[in-house]
Amino acid sequence: MDQKQIEEIVRSVMASMGQTAPAPSEAKCTTTTCAAPVTSESCALDLGSAEAKAWIGVENPHRADVLTELRRSTVARVCTGRAGPRPRTQALLRFLADHSRSKDTVLKEVPEEWVKAQGLLEVRSEISDKNLYLTRPDMGRRLCAEAVEALKAQCVANPDVQVVISDGLSTDAITVNYEEILPPLMAGLKQAGLKVGTPFFVRYGRVKIEDQIGEILGAKVVILLVGERPGLGQSESLSCYAVYSPRMATTVEADRTCISNIHQGGTPPVEAAAVIVDLAKRMLEQKASGINMTR
C-alpha cells in the first residue's frame, strides 16, 4: 500500500465521521516547514550507557518537561516513541542489547580468582557445567560428595546463622553487590551476639540447596544470597532466602522468607544487610520462618 492509498483511506474515514480530512502530506520536507525532533538516533551511542537509558524518542512532544520527569522516575521502557506502528531503531537496538546482557549474565561463570580474592571456601552442587545447571535444576539442589566433606571439615558446626553465597542465575548480582552486603551482614550478625558460621560460596546452587547445608552443619538459620534471574537491562539483582532449621525431607517453599530485588536500583545492599540481620533475630526468637512467622 502506497502513500496515496493511505491518504485516500484517511479521507474516506474522516468523511464518514463528518470531519474534514487533513491535507495530503508533502513529498519533501524542508527545515522551514518541519520541526527538528527532540532527540536524534545515533548508532555511535553506547546502548548500555546511562545516556542511552535516558534517551527520549518521542518526537515533537507537547510537554517535553513531563516526558523528562517521567523518564527520570522509572527504569521502565517509557518515552521511546514510535515510527508508525513500529518501535524506533534506537529503542529496538537497546531492547536487543539489554536482552543480550541478560543472557550473558546467566551464562557467565563467577571467576575462581574472584572467589579466592574474597577468601571464601568454594564448593559446588552436583552440577559440573553451566549447561547442565540450566537443564537439570534438581541436581543444583544437592551438594556433591566432595562439597559435603569440605563443609564438615572446614566450617563451624551448629551456628545460629549460616550465610551462603551462590551464583544462581546471575553472576553479576554476586560480584557487584558482594562488597556492600556481606561485610555489613556478617558484622551485624556478630554485633547481635549470634554465633555465625563460616561463609562460603556454592557454585551452580539452587535455592533448596540451603536445606542440605543447614542439615549438615546443624544451623538454626540459613541465609542464602543468590543471583536472581535477570530481567531486561537489570542483571545485578540479588535475592536472600532465609529459612529456620531446614531439613531436606520436610522443608517446603512456604517455609522460606525471601527478600528480593537487592541492588542499587532496588533495595540497596547495605540496607538489605540490616533487614536480614533483623530477620534472622526474629526467626531465632520465634523459631520459625516463612508463613509460620508472626509480624
UniProtKB/Swiss-Prot annotation:
Its annotated pathway? Answer: Amine and polyamine degradation; ethanolamine degradation
Give the main EC class.
lyase
Spell out the Pfam families in the cross-references.
EutC
Q: Which domain of life is it from?
A: Bacteria
Q: What is its EC number?
A: 4.3.1.7
What cofactor(s) does the depicted protein rely on?
adenosylcob(III)alamin
Which cellular component, as a GO term, is one annotated location? ethanolamine ammonia-lyase complex
Coiled coil (residue ranges): none
Against InterPro entries, the record matches this protein to: EutC, EutC_C
Similarity remark = Belongs to the EutC family.
The record describes the protein's role as: Catalyzes the deamination of various vicinal amino-alcohols to oxo compounds. Allows this organism to utilize ethanolamine as the sole source of nitrogen and carbon in the presence of external vitamin B12.
By what name is this protein known?
Answer: Ethanolamine ammonia-lyase small subunit
The organism named in the record is Escherichia coli O139:H28 (strain E24377A / ETEC)
